[in-house]
Amino acid sequence: MHHLLEQSADMATALLAGEKLRELILPGSQDDKAGALAALLLQLKLELPFDRVVTIGTVLVPILLVTLVFTKNFAEEPIYCYTPHNFTRDQALYARGYCWTELRDALPGVDASLWPSLFEHKFLPYALLAFAAIMYVPALGWEFLASTRLTSELNFLLQEIDNCYHRAAEGRAPKIEKQIQSKGPGITEREKREIIENAEKEKSPEQNLFEKYLERRGRSNFLAKLYLARHVLILLLSVVPISYLCTYYATQKQNEFTCALGASPDGPVGSAGPTVRVSCKLPSVQLQRIIAGVDIVLLCFMNLIILVNLIHLFIFRKSNFIFDKLHKVGIKTRRQWRRSQFCDINILAMFCNENRDHIKSLNRLDFITNESDLMYDNVVRQLLAALAQSNHDTTPTVRDSGIQTVDPSINPAEPEGSAEPPVVKRPRKKMKWIPTSNPLPQPFKEQLAIMRVENSKTEKPKPVRRKTATDTLIAPLLDAGARAAHHYKGSGGDTGPSSAPPAASEKKHTRHFSLDVHPYILGSKKAKTEAVPPALPASRSQEGGFLSQTEECGLGLAAAPTKDAPLPEKEIPYPTESALPSGGPFHVCSPPTASAAASLSPSSLGKADPLTILSRNATHPLLHISTLYEAREEEEGGPCAPSDMGDLLSIPPPQQILIATFEEPRTVVSTVEF
């Protein structure tokens, strides 16, 4: 018993851990979305971080230093000349311009051709600009010569690395999984390793092609030559600025000199008098010396870094970054591919590592490499085989696995080595995802119950519009024809007391097809066939309860005028009020009980003359709409709610509700019998 409980707990833990690992390792549809987004936002980097640092140190920094010198010369005068006090303004400006052009120190007692020149101070900013342009030539040559080939190589490599991972995770893993399952639960670790090793020997054409490609790149050195030539050229070109700046820094220390302007203009004409000498000073010499020293140190440091990087790349480096992880997905990286370190594989490995953002399965490859000591050599296949062995599920996020529990009906004293293990497997339940816009869980709703409740709800009275003249003229004619046909059918057969329930049922089913104002309806659900409602009283029925002449007199209602009497065999064409609908439980002016009994006497139930039928039932007794009330259907035996409605909702009994009220006089028009 204890052994079974521990096994069940281990299985649950394995399923939970396998779910997390599967989400991490298996490629999914999110890879395609991430890859499409990365293709839009990222581009291939054709320059390594080390190369960018070298370009900044040899090109951008000297340009920045030159900018400082030009800014200082623009902000203040490049030369100061101390002219005598008797010089005018124009003479002082001329002396300053002449001395800035000559820049020769007029030493006394020395021939003029031997005077030292200070022209290097003026030329240094332009020399720094020229050196920066020269140092950019290697980077420009690499971009033009190697960018096209390097781009094609990287596109193929990055895509093929992802394909190798997907083929290993989705292609070969199911084969190993089936072979392990075919061995049964008694498979040993040695047999599992043999299955994995045999699967390693089977290679797809794509894997063979990729291995051949890596072998060819390991034997070629085109990119390696270009990369080496770039950095060697930087080393050679940096010798020129270093030599010039060292010479300038060592020799050009003087910032003050004497400028010879020539003979005095006040002297006699044609006589060689003493020359006028002016003391001058260059304020930017100290700044230029600092810039020269910084540039010398920077260039020397860049050269040292380049040398160290080249030695490490082509002599001492043993790792190839991403290529060292390919053996985990079935690609054998053979050491004999690289006859020497001076090959394209080293260069491509550095650029692949720089463009690792384009490798969608990089995180999974890193996981496999970091956890390889905890699992078998082929982590992807072994892990997927274990996951598939525990449960077959095509959905990567929702599992429908059954949970093994101990059967409560077994005897705990029974030994564990029985024929069948006392384990009951719960039925598997498929979890179905219901898409919804609301992130919160939706409560379960029963559609049948909802329909019943909605049908049993009482409707609110709707406002009735006032009828126009057209409705008043057309509605009675349409309704009169329908009522005459119904009455004719009812009076053609047996018109005994048993004909009252069919009339009530017919009224119930035709109540929704009225052309007039709809009555207030309790529910739209049809009554069951076994529950037949009792018939309405004859005094309340709209099918047969028409007011006769005697009843009208008994109620005190005004009869039709005498001038309408001489209209034999003719209907009233246009009544003053519209007819009531042919269906609906309305309260009409109820006559006394005696008149109702008289109307149901055998003498009155005989077959009437067709002319009398047409003259009596041509139009409905016209009542004003203010007399419409809802009938008490439960008391009168009319249609009621089904019997199972009380289980869902308790509905209060209907009340007499006034639909609409108008202050117009009530008029009742009836036919005249002849």
From Swiss-Prot:
GO BP: any one term: monoatomic ion transmembrane transport
Compartments where found: Cell membrane; Golgi apparatus membrane; Endoplasmic reticulum membrane
Tissue-wise expression: Expressed in the eye, thyroid, prostate, kidney and liver. Abundantly expressed in the CNS, including hippocampus, olfactory bulb, cortex, cerebellum. Not detected in the white matter.
Residues bearing attached sugar chains per UniProt: 86
Keyword Ribonucleoprotein assigned: no
List of residues that carry Phosphoserine: 590, 601
GO molecular function: gap junction channel activity; protein-containing complex binding; structural molecule activity; wide pore channel activity
Transmembrane segments: 54-74, 126-146, 231-251, 296-316
Record's comment on post-translational modification: S-palmitoylated in neural stem and progenitor cells.
Family indicated by similarity: Belongs to the pannexin family.
PANTHER family: PANNEXIN, PANNEXIN-2
Protein name, entry field: Pannexin-2
Gene this chain is encoded by: Panx2
